[in-house]
Amino acid sequence: MYKRQVTADYFHKKTKDLIVSGIKASTVVGNSFSPVNAGNITNKGFELELGWQDRIGDFAYGVRANVATLKNKVTKMHESLSSIDGATYVTYGAITRFEVGKPAWYFYGYDFMGVDSKTGEPIFRDIDGVEGITDNDKTEIGKGIADYTYGITLNAAWKGFDFILFGTGSQGNDVFCGLNRVDYNLNQLTYFTKNRWTESNRNGKTPASGATDYTKYLTSSGCVFDGSYFKIKQIQLGYSFPKQLIKKVAIENLRIYGSLEDFFTFTDYPGFDPEVTGVGNSLGVDKGSYPNSKKVVLGLSVTF
């Protein structure tokens, strides 16, 4: 006997009067930024879930999959503000921004166009048309919010054996990689060094280590990567001993199992883990936080 399930939902949520730090207070109180009801956000999208359970003799199996889309947009801000800077990267300035018409806390920086093959200097898009690259040339360079997320679960059982595979993923989100600080010599990614411009590698994709505008590169699209991924969160295989066997030793249920957790990740992101932990105005910002650990789990479940 099979069982199937289909669930579909549409959501359109409007959030009003978000509280953020945005207005600079008087110098009398330290000239810090005071909290303010800065604006409104809309989130809308679809959620779809499909499920299938069936049995063929002693073999039972099931498949469950889900996908959710999300479109996020800032629709209104406090009248005294045109935008609000968010997460910062060391002393190089803000890398996220809150602004009407954009996704909440989108990545904000210079548009990196490549490396000058003669000098190793980074090249940026000149947006304001004025000679020289300044803060006025910063623009939207990515977003930490995924276009859609998805998951899949496979399960099966046969004569005491049971198996489950669970995976999740996201698509359309970016990650700002903050692991290439020139003032810090730990945990840097090989991507930046292997692709760096040198006299013997004039086609390098990242600027020379002594480039004049290197700090601008660190807040540019050159440090923004596709954060899409699919991760197998768990693979578990177990075996439950026959009751007629274990009841002889006064055991009601006995199950042994082994699992691999967070063991397999499929992504083009060069950092430690595309599933970064940044939240709020740091969504999608990777500053080197500890990645999810790969785990091998062996277990025994006993019921007397």
At which residue positions do the language-model features occur?
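Conserved small/polar residues in nucleotide/adenosyl-binding loops
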Residues: 1-2
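Outer-membrane beta-barrel and related beta-rich outer-membrane complex signature
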Residues: 7, 18-22, 62, 69-87, ...
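Membrane-embedded beta-strand positions of outer-membrane beta-barrel proteins
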Residues: 8, 50, 63-65, 165, ...
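Transmembrane beta-strands of outer-membrane beta-barrel pores
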Residues: 10-16, 52-54, 67-73, 158-160, ...
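Conserved small-residue
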Residues: 20, 53-144, 268
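C-terminal beta-signal and terminal closure region of outer-membrane beta-barrel proteins
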Residues: 35-43, 87-119, 194-196, 217, ...
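Hydrophobic, lipid-facing positions within transmembrane beta-strands of outer-membrane proteins
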Residues: 44-50, 148-154, 161, 232-237, ...
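Extracytoplasmic gating/loop element in the C-terminal half of outer-membrane beta-barrel translocons
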Residues: 170-261
